[in-house]
Amino acid sequence: MKMKIIVLFLYYCYIGSTSSVLASIDNVNELSVLLSVKSTLVDPLNFLKDWKLSDTSDHCNWTGVRCNSNGNVEKLDLAGMNLTGKISDSISQLSSLVSFNISCNGFESLLPKSIPPLKSIDISQNSFSGSLFLFSNESLGLVHLNASGNNLSGNLTEDLGNLVSLEVLDLRGNFFQGSLPSSFKNLQKLRFLGLSGNNLTGELPSVLGQLPSLETAILGYNEFKGPIPPEFGNINSLKYLDLAIGKLSGEIPSELGKLKSLETLLLYENNFTGTIPREIGSITTLKVLDFSDNALTGEIPMEITKLKNLQLLNLMRNKLSGSIPPAISSLAQLQVLELWNNTLSGELPSDLGKNSPLQWLDVSSNSFSGEIPSTLCNKGNLTKLILFNNTFTGQIPATLSTCQSLVRVRMQNNLLNGSIPIGFGKLEKLQRLELAGNRLSGGIPGDISDSVSLSFIDFSRNQIRSSLPSTILSIHNLQAFLVADNFISGEVPDQFQDCPSLSNLDLSSNTLTGTIPSSIASCEKLVSLNLRNNNLTGEIPRQITTMSALAVLDLSNNSLTGVLPESIGTSPALELLNVSYNKLTGPVPINGFLKTINPDDLRGNSGLCGGVLPPCSKFQRATSSHSSLHGKRIVAGWLIGIASVLALGILTIVTRTLYKKWYSNGFCGDETASKGEWPWRLMAFHRLGFTASDILACIKESNMIGMGATGIVYKAEMSRSSTVLAVKKLWRSAADIEDGTTGDFVGEVNLLGKLRHRNIVRLLGFLYNDKNMMIVYEFMLNGNLGDAIHGKNAAGRLLVDWVSRYNIALGVAHGLAYLHHDCHPPVIHRDIKSNNILLDANLDARIADFGLARMMARKKETVSMVAGSYGYIAPEYGYTLKVDEKIDIYSYGVVLLELLTGRRPLEPEFGESVDIVEWVRRKIRDNISLEEALDPNVGNCRYVQEEMLLVLQIALLCTTKLPKDRPSMRDVISMLGEAKPRRKSNSNEENTSRSLAEKHSSVFSTSPVNGLL
């Protein structure tokens, strides 16, 4: 009966098309249907504002609506509009509809079962759950189905095999399980098959080898096991095969060598064994070959050198042996060669890099020997040279010290000798120079002090014999300088007045003499200072006790004299102090962490006493008093301490009485207490001048300053310590409480509380009980970056110049680089956006809101749901649900575009289904001047626009579609260094433009990326 009704309906629609009157009636009906569809949608950004009745209403011109020549709706494209709600059943009345796209929204409700026959359905990047809807005979004409990036589950049914017209099937990033249906063999027209990022199991079906039209097969990030079917070698049209990250095993079939069109082959992170098939060398079209993270054995086959189009070869983390085929240096397109963590031996090909645009060479943790080839940077593209943990001998090639593209040089733990070549300090992109654990001699080249880019220098465990260059510690970007275990002599340079970035200084185990310069206290970012095992004399400068970031101070095994500074125990951040085996005297202060310091960290000082050491004798006290005025202060301190204890006891009694009175009438009233929400526990990550009670007193509606996806934020003013805090009370569902997840969450927050970086909002503490959780962190005076850019707070008036915005971009990059590269395990934020970047009183950027962050103990980790914010989410996040640092880098790129354009990630002006990334890329494709995209409030003159365009290129690199093509955050920092604003007078503007134009292409030399689009 239903089929008859549909047939009659279609028949009358056809007859009606011959009559203008009936056509008009039909259009009115479709208009009503569209309004009915709109009525069940939630449209917070008002994208569908033109969907309304008016005297001139023509629904064919409405946003997202396309009609055929008869005036009937044939396409609905509502992608990227932030829509929620449900799709009305009335959509079934759009009988001419053939294409339906609601991707990148927030829909959760299932589609109506009465959806009309379609050729294209795109419901990707939503929150649909449940099983994939069943297909009726009316769906047999379906050509394009994209349901990626949802929460769909269940098994893939045999019904999918009935869609014989299907060309694109994209189900990536869901929770499908079970094995692949054998009916897939019926999909003879299928060109694209995307199933990655699910929980599919079983073996790969050999019937996939019967799909003659298949060009792209993305099946990785699943639980497939067993071997690769040799029948896969029959898919002659296959260009892209991704079977990465699974449980596949056995040998790689030699039949893959028959895939004459294949360009990308990804088999990394499986359990493949055996040797690399020599037949792989027959795939002359191959550009990307990644067999990393398996258990492959044997040698690298000589046939690999026949892959003349090969750009990337990654065989790292296997069990390969033997040497590198010498002819690999003849591959004219090779950009990336990663072989680290194998058992390879022999020498590197002597002309490696001579014929290829080599950008990235990593052969670390092998058994390579011989000399380092001098040709590695012949083409001028080498950015990363990583050779550590081998047995390379000879000298460091002088050609490397003139390689202007270098960003990282890591050669530690080899047998290199000779001196450090002069010239590394002149490489404007070089960030890391790691030469530790070799046999290098001579001195530290003086040009190192002139570097404008070096952030990490490690010359430890060598045989360097010289004094330190006087300005070595004043390198502007220097964060770590490590020269331990050498023969460095002379005094510690007294040139600390300009060390804005230095956080780690290790001069231990040398022969340094003289005193510790008091000017070292000017290094505001210094976290670790290690001067142990030297010949230092004099007293410990009391200025050290005021250093706001210093957490580790090791002065052991020297000849320091005098007393411990009284305030050293209450130093703002100090957590570890070792002054053992010196000549210190006098009582040990009993304040701060010195009350519980390990006595071993004080031993070897015969004159020290008191505190955690044995009590001071009268003789020691007299000696101490005679030798300095500190004795009087200590006696006064004891008297004041006794008085303070008495006063504190009285104050405690009074406070408890007053608090009980407040507690019965304030925030935590009797009702709350009766529900078990007491006691509150305060976990402190820093020394705090307030209590849980102080915080709770501020949690009231009048102090609320924000509300987000993770909780409510309150401003809390601590009158006792004149401190202003931000307190986030986290949302918690009843299920969370019943599941008892508090302990896990506390553990995670405890890890995050240990983060220390100037561009990360400091977590000061964590307040919790059985029902509620609150995170306490620094209050940022200038709010968040999103409001500043888009004009919602006063800080926006301070961001009208490019230098301020650039500095914010650089600060965020440093913060993310710390999370990704310096934390162990690394921290993936997962929700980088302008609203999660806070601005302090100096407009320095601080990354905030780790409500979605996860500590990544492994390189890849599955998450239970898509997190992040629309407009900032990386495209692969919807189909892999496996997160790594690349999703943060994409989001960072979007933030860069916000800073550059002054626009939000999603704006109606961009067009339907277009975000800011695509909006900019379209301008490039359409040859539209990119200056038009820049914020006119900032880029109002030519040289500023040129500087901004350099950063725009970095933003485009960060937002490339493929995660592997995105740079790391360390690369981003290097590129931003190239794009640093250079202010010149108007008379020099022409020269400025020319110099920037020359740098325009070099920005990309720090990342192996071929293009922007």
From Swiss-Prot:
CC annotations in GO: plasma membrane; pollen tube
Catalytic residues identified in the record: 831
Name the record gives this protein: MDIS1-interacting receptor like kinase 1
Gene Ontology biological process: cell differentiation; phloem or xylem histogenesis; pollen tube guidance; procambium histogenesis; protein autophosphorylation; protein phosphorylation
Family affiliation: Belongs to the protein kinase superfamily. Ser/Thr protein kinase family.
Region Disordered, annotated ranges: 976-1013
Gene from which this protein is expressed: MIK1
The record's account of how the chain is modified after translation: Autophosphorylation induced by the interaction with LURE1.2.
TM ranges: 634-654
Disruption phenotype: Reduced procambial cells number, and adjacent or interspersed xylem and phloem formation.
